[in-house]
């Protein structure tokens, strides 16, 4: 089988002038998340920074996600609801939202996670202060019922290309980048780890800086992709390095092993119990 190279597409960086400095585009894929998505949307609506648009792309949910989201979008025009014609995965859903995004600032929030009310305001202020174009924050873990499990996850203060290859340090729900400086890079077509694949693409252009504040809550669900078997995660990491990062068989294997080591390191060093 031929080893095909993936070339990331970079969408136009032309932004409407009135939005060039303030608008945040929030990228939210969803699939059968009716139980949680209302709470997620409310956490965005409660932001102290109100200049945002929330692009919710539904990957053909079979529950009543559409009814819940439409109730919000009918009363808040900043919420844009898009339904895909076929179930295609989170990468396709996120890419669809990216193509529609009008904001300078691009942020990511999955449909079962939550933001603290000052997340956008504080993170943008931090990025402007240090002139960063790519950043992430600490986040807490919550259980399916929304109760905190007393864990805070952090990471390195600065993540360059080499360190990003070592491990996926940023939590997707905390990442923000400056579209003016970086552009809109297409997420590689991979079922799992597609957020990590995007961070790797962005790391070619800019380092990722940690804003060392807890500004989001990640919902740990037993049925989510993030809770897949350990062996499956290892296989998908190898697939990412081999097929998306175009590494040799040997390099992909070494990077995968390296990821296992740094994953253990992150749990020991950057996971704090309250």
Give short role names for the model-derived ranges.
Residues 106:
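Short aromatic/hydrophobic "clamp" motif used to bind/position activated sugar donors
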Residues 118-149:
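Conserved donor NDP-sugar-binding/catalytic core segment of glycosyltransferases
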Residues 43, 50, 58-67, 86, ...:
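A conserved acidic beta->alpha catalytic loop
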Residues 84-101, 122:
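Glycine-rich, basic loop-to-helix element that forms the pyrophosphate-binding segment
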Residues 35-38, 63-71, 114, 118:
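Acidic helix N-cap motif at the loop->helix transition within catalytic regions
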Residues 1-45:
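N-proximal low-complexity "stem/linker" segments adjacent to membrane-targeting elements
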Residues 22-25, 53, 197:
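Cell-envelope/extracellular polymer assembly enzymes that use nucleotide-activated donors
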Residues 99, 152-232, 236-237:
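Conserved nucleotide-sugar donor-binding catalytic segment
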């Amino acid at each position: 089988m031929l080893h095909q190279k993936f070339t990331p597409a970079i969408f136009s960086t032309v932004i409407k002038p009135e939005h060039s400095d303030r608008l945040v585009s929030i990228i939210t894929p969803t699939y059968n998340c009716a139980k949680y998505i209302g709470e997620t949307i409310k956490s965005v609506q409660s932001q102290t920074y109100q200049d945002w648009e929330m692009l919710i792309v539904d990957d053909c949910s079979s529950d009543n996600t559409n009814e819940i989201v439409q109730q919000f979008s009918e009363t808040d025009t900043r919420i844009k609801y898009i339904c895909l014609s076929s179930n295609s995965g989170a990468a396709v859903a996120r890419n669809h939202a990216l193509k529609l995004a009008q904001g300078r600032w691009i942020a990511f929030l999955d449909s079962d996670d939550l933001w603290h009310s000052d997340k956008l305001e504080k993170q943008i202020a931090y990025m402007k202060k240090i002139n960063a174009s790519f950043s992430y924050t600490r986040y807490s873990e919550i259980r399916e019922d929304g109760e905190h499990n007393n864990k805070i996850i952090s990471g390195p203060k600065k993540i360059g290309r080499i360190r990003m290859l070592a491990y996926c340090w940023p939590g997707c729900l905390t990442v923000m980048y400056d579209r003016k400086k970086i552009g809109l890079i297409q997420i590689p077509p991979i079922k799992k780890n597609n957020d990590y694949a995007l961070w790797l693409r962005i790391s070619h252009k800019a380092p990722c800086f940690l804003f060392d504040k807890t500004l989001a809550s990640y919902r740990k669900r037993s049925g989510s992709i993030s809770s897949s078997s350990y062996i499956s995660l290892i296989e998908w990491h190898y697939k990412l390095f081999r097929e998306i990062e175009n590494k040799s068989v040997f390099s992909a294997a070494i990077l995968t092993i390296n990821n296992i080591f740094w994953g253990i390191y992150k749990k020991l060093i950057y996971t704090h119990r309250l």
